């Protein structure tokens, strides 16, 4: 369970690299994707081993990167979300479908004006 705060994000999530399989690199590049990818900014997996000489930054770096993806994807809603998020095998596609589903009906969400006190508490989390 990850409890969001700016400090926790910087320490536990922001350094988690994207990851992919060596067998997919050529196909991705031929489609104009992953052009800036390297062993410095991505974890590359071949068969059952990590190719990066230094290994993983965190034992669960893949999970942490999925959290990073979810934070970025859900930020595209355009307003802070106060709520819980749980995913199994999360992906950009799944996050996109979630966002579309939530925004499809105004009954699925509530826009609220926060009191000054709540705003101050919220700002502490991101300070």
Which residue stretches match the model-derived regions?
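C-terminal regulatory domains involved in ligand/effector binding and gene-expression control
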Residues: 1-127
